[in-house]
From Swiss-Prot:
Function text: This heterodimer may have anti-inflammatory properties, since the myrmexin complex (composed of 6 SS-LS heterodimers) inhibits carrageenin-induced edema in a dose-dependent manner (after subcutaneous injection into rats).
Location, primary (coarse class): secreted
Domain of life: Eukaryota
Protein's cellular compartments: Secreted
Name of the featured protein: U1-pseudomyrmecitoxin-Pt1 subunit SS2
Keywords on record: Disulfide bond, Secreted
Gene Ontology CC annotation, any one: extracellular region
Tissue localization of expression: Expressed by the venom gland.
Organism: Pseudomyrmex triplarinus
Complex and partners: Heterodimer composed of subunit SS2 and subunit LS1 (U1-PSDTX-Pt1e), and heterodimer composed of subunit SS2 and LS2 (U1-PSDTX-Pt1c); disulfide-linked.
Sequence similarity: Belongs to the myrmexin family.
Other comment: There are 6 heterodimeric myrmexins which consist of a small subunit (SS1 or SS2 or SS3) disulfide-linked to a larger, quite structurally unrelated subunit (LS1 or LS2).
Amino acid sequence: LFGGLLDKLREKIKKYCNKENLDKACSKL
């Protein structure tokens, strides 16, 4: 259950990072 939530959250963050081009903040993901 928890792992699935983390995966969804990570996907949202990746999409946001791609949209906003926050390379430094998102390279850690």
